Amino acid sequence: TMIDKIVPRPDAEIARQLAERGIEGMEILPRARGAAVAPFVNAEETQYLCIEDHYTNGRPPLELGGVLYCDRETVDKIEKMKVCTCLNPLHTAMSIYGCMLGYTLISAEMADEDLRAFIQKIGYIEAMPVVVDPGVLNPYEFIGAVINRRLPNPFMPDAPQRIATDTSQKLAIRFGETIKAYEARGLDKSNLILIPLVLAGYARYLKGIDDNGQAFEPSTDPLLAELQAIV
């Protein structure tokens, strides 16, 4: 199964806007370990759910609600398209540089022309030549929705600090697979300019100093202390 729908924790600004509209009882309630619950959910409009069609005695008609039924190989291809090319690499690139530039919202980063161009070029120019095409979803339509609808959405208050969590565990799959695909297909790796810049940016991020020379706290990561000792 592959599901793709970002649902951040309840946001105080969304609660305020709901209250302004006369909707009562929308208070956010803190929970253990920094979690929170609320009667509302701030989530994306765009959503994907792909399920392996491997039922023993019929299956519910979830396709009527937009669910994609496909074989296991296709589910894997959809996951690779998303994780290696069309969404997750862009997310990680934005999170690293967003933290260093003082952003706290992904949607605000998308208003920065340089950052927007940065992820567009990573996706369209460097990663798409080796994208895994699952057939049932168009990679260009998928990444177009990411850049033009999902990331700029101000009502989906996702933060670069959240996305930057465990970055050391994500770099290999989100960028290494593209580099390996270039090697396997005999493509010119010198065309990869911005993906190496993401990796260099991560080394800079690990220092915990933002673009104004002020200290910031990197997001939690199992290798944080080890990597900070190296850089």
Model-predicted regions and their roles:
Residues 1-231:
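Substrate/ligand-engaging "lid" and interaction regions
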